[in-house]
A protein has these predicted regions:
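Hydrophobic alpha-helical segments and their helix-loop boundaries in membrane
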Residues: 1-167
């Protein structure tokens, strides 16, 4: 559950970076390089989670998990599977929600480039548009990172309050 929240921040950063052509900036030669936006969001999210007491709540959840899953008893797969699927779907939904402003700006940018290219076919619109989308992506990250992290920590706190989503 909690790990999926971190993955949702990474995914949101990846979607945002790919939407704004910033996915390879400072990319490493590792197996799965995460864009710089993803690193920024994950580090900010982890710092925010620690300030909100994630470490205490995680220890509390581990202790209370023995009430739900007693030692030497297997969990029923027919109840765990739907919960896991809901968590994965919710994490991806949260990631897209967090990165939606970047995707919207990307669509507007591409439509604008298409109109400009249609109006002036001899103009190299990529040379004009690339700095614009790069600057817009960085400016959007500057403005939206606090809001993104606030929405994320609220969702994490809600999950930590009731991890199984019951009434």
């Amino acid at each position: 559950g909690i790990r999926l929240f971190l993955l949702s921040l990474q995914t949101a950063g990846t979607i945002a970076a790919q939407s704004t052509s910033l996915s390879q900036i400072l990319g490493s030669a590792g197996i799965e390089p995460i864009p710089a936006m993803g690193y920024l969001l994950v580090v900010g999210g982890l710092a925010l989670a620690m300030m909100a007491g994630l470490h205490v709540r995680a220890a509390e959840m581990m202790i209370l998990s023995y009430d739900l899953f007693p030692v030497a008893e297997l969990a029923a797969s027919d109840t765990i599977t739907p919960w896991g699927v809901r968590q994965v779907a919710g994490a991806f939904g949260l990631a897209f929600t967090l990165s939606a402003p970047f995707a919207i700006v990307s669509v507007i940018y591409n439509l604008t480039l298409g109109v400009i290219n249609r109006a002036m076919p001899q103009m190299m619109v990529v040379f004009v548009g690339a700095p614009v989308i790069t600057g817009a992506g960085i400016a959007l990250l500057l403005v939206l990172a606090p809001i993104i992290l606030q929405v994320w920590i609220e969702a994490l706190t809600l999950f930590m309050t009731n991890p199984f989503g019951g009434p």
